[in-house]
Amino acid sequence: MSGIIEAKKQLVEQIADQLKNSVSTVIVNYRGLTVAEVTELRKQLREAGVEYKVYKNTMMRRAAEQAGLEGLDEFLTGPTAVATSTEDVVAPAKVIAGFAKEHEALEIKTGVMDGSIISAEEVKTVGSLPSHDGLVSMLLSVLQAPVRNFAYAVKAVGESKEESAE
């Protein structure tokens, strides 16, 4: 019997470490999804570098307590799955929010970002943001635009002076 308890303690520690080390976590209710839909969701999350697991709620409660995430208990009822990412803050929210739009059976319960609990609406909002790379490319294009426009203006002035010289 003590072997089972030890295994459960190790699982709780593993989940707590996962919660502590992740930059973004989304907790969902997957009731009503078919096996094919869950498989598709797992595939999309895997491609985005997100880990998706189903844990017992009691294990999640203990792990959340160990990880210092008070207030998560109220969301840990019914079928619960957890999507975590250690690299991209937006990835779990983006994939799950997009999947939830197509499949109404997937219900976003809550999320955790930077150690604080966020609502389902906030998860959807984060999911609508572009990825880090997308934001960087937007910033670069905004920074390049004035320089590019200046270069075009200088070129136009140079061409007009050449035409007037001829």
UniProtKB/Swiss-Prot annotation:
InterPro entries for this protein: Ribosomal_uL10, Ribosomal_uL10-like_sf, Ribosomal_uL10_bac, Ribosomal_uL10_bac_type, Ribosomal_uL10_CS_bac
Gene Ontology BP terms: translation
Matches recorded under PROSITE patterns: RIBOSOMAL_L10
A Pfam entry, by short name: Ribosomal_L10
Paired cysteines (S-S): none
Molecular functions (GO terms): large ribosomal subunit rRNA binding; structural constituent of ribosome
Transmembrane segments: none
Record has Iron-sulfur as a keyword: no
Protein's job: Forms part of the ribosomal stalk, playing a central role in the interaction of the ribosome with GTP-bound translation factors.
Subunit record text: Part of the ribosomal stalk of the 50S ribosomal subunit. The N-terminus interacts with L11 and the large rRNA to form the base of the stalk. The C-terminus forms an elongated spine to which L12 dimers bind in a sequential fashion forming a multimeric L10(L12)X complex.
PANTHER family per record: 39S RIBOSOMAL PROTEIN L10, MITOCHONDRIAL
Family, per entry: Belongs to the universal ribosomal protein uL10 family.
Classification via HAMAP family: Ribosomal_uL10
Protein name (record): Large ribosomal subunit protein uL10
Gene: rplJ
